[in-house]
Design a protein with these regions (language model features):
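Bacterial N-terminal signal peptides
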Residues: 1-6
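A short, solvent-exposed, low-complexity linear motif enriched for acidic/polar residues
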Residues: 49-407
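Ser/Thr-rich, Pro/Gly/Ala-heavy low-complexity intrinsically disordered linkers and tails
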Residues: 7-54
């Protein structure tokens, strides 16, 4: 599947939808959302310099509850079992033999909107009908923690957290059960005005770093090499077997008029766009984040192989056999050329495979920008763009993605 991300020139990182002090997270009236109602505190009273958050009350039959999920992969990570794991397995494996786990996976959601008529313009799905309701954050969410609601996969390992609830249109009354409403959301730079949905004390420390650096997404985790012993004298032998990493991306974007995999496909669309409520129950609308997109080796193509070697080869302790655990930062990755990867010591980094369903090319490891150009061939820029494509709806629904930053 080919993905298309649109860049909107002139769109900055400033959030134009910040709530005024004391404002609700919704748009008023029966479309009120987010902190409205009689829900429970979402972060156990821990704000850590952010704004407090109250879990939205159940919107009831005919209402919409908005949740956020990083699926089970943001919570459990990516295991690697030598001789068993596959690039196209479930879950997919890093082809170079690394097990990757996240301690924190932070995303700041700016707003969630509902519009009339998701099918208004089939040639341009970004063109929707009138605004019906809006929940305005920002909401700071840790996808590696999740919440008490089982996600769209049905797996108990997919733990999602609610950020907003719509009981009906902002103008009053109830949603119509015989029509679909276009659903969209935005991501924005981390800010002290964000409501702390579920960040713990350690996550709040990382979030402060995200605020300082203008990051929308911030990840911390650890990778452990689980593949076969590397060849003696190779650059792979000089990599630490354990790498702690911090990744952050200043990549605000709009995810517009999303497809809904809960609905039956019709016509030329893979899935219909929008949400449709039920008179007999609430409807779950799940913002879904796919963490694998960050580690793809080709932009704008679904499901390309995952690699960690470029990050490991940039680690602080790279350079000797049996190197101790190392650390990799975004500054390390910004300095790398993704068209010809090198190690921290400047040696060419070859391709390799530790799985049976990926055959590595000859020569130096190089990623494919697939027509996307950057001011320089920085791996940091590549990662930022690729991470942006991870936003979906209801598991695998595609959205019209508009980049509110310069690639």
């Amino acid at each position: 599947m080919v993905l298309v991300l649109a860049w909107t020139p002139g769109c900055g990182e400033e959030d134009e939808n910040k709530p005024e002090p004391g404002a609700s997270a919704g748009s008023g009236g029966s479309g009120q959302a987010g902190n409205g109602g009689s829900g429970q505190a979402g972060s156990g009273g821990l704000s850590g310099g952010l704004q407090p958050f109250t879990t939205p009350a159940d919107p009831g039959n005919g209402g919409i509850l908005v949740t956020v999920s990083g699926e089970d992969l943001a919570i459990n990570g990516y295991p690697f079992i030598s001789g068993t794991s596959k690039s196209e397995g479930d879950p997919p494996a890093f082809v170079d033999g690394w097990e990757v786990k996240f301690n924190h996976f932070l995303v700041t959601i700016g707003s969630v909107t509902l519009h009339d008529n998701p099918d208004k313009n089939p040639d341009d799905p970004k063109d929707m009908g009138a605004l019906v309701a809006e929940a305005t954050g920002p909401f700071a969410v840790d996808l590696s923690i999740g919440g008490p609601i089982v996600g769209k996969s049905g797996s108990p390992d997919e733990k999602t957290v609610a950020i907003a609830a719509f009981t009906g249109p902002a103008s009053g009354g109830k949603f119509q059960t015989d029509q679909r409403y276009a659903i969209s959301y935005t991501t924005v730079a981390a800010t002290a005005q964000a409501r702390n949905v579920n960040l713990d004390a350690e996550g709040l420390v990382l979030y402060q770093q995200a605020i300082a650096k203008g990051w929308v997404m911030a990840l911390q985790g650890k990778a452990t090499y689980k593949g076969k012993p590397p060849k003696a004298g190779s650059v792979f032998e000089k990599m630490p077997r354990e790498v702690t990493f911090t990744l952050g991306f200043a990549n605000p974007a709009s995810y517009l008029n999303c497809q809904n995999t809960d609905l039956t496909p019709v016509g030329d669309e893979e899935f219909p766009r929008g949400v449709q409520v039920s008179a007999g129950d609430k409807t779950i609308a799940q913002i879904t984040w796919h963490s694998d997109h960050i580690f793809w080796n080709k932009l704008n193509v679904e499901g390309t192989p995952l690699h960690f070697d470029p990050i490991a080869a940039a680690a602080s302790t790279y350079g000797s056999k049996d190197a101790p655990p190392g650390v990799t930062t975004m500054e390390d990755l910004d300095a790398l050329d993704f068209l010809a990867f090198k190690t921290r010591d400047g040696e060419p980094l070859p391709w390799r495979s530790e799985v049976e369903d990926f055959t590595p090319p000859e020569g130096t490891l190089a990623f494919d920008g697939n027509g996307v150009t950057f001011p320089k061939n920085s791996f940091g820029h590549f990662l930022r763009y690729s991470a942006t494509s991870g936003g979906h709806f209801n598991a695998n629904g595609e959205c019209e993605v508009v980049l509110n930053f310069t690639p």
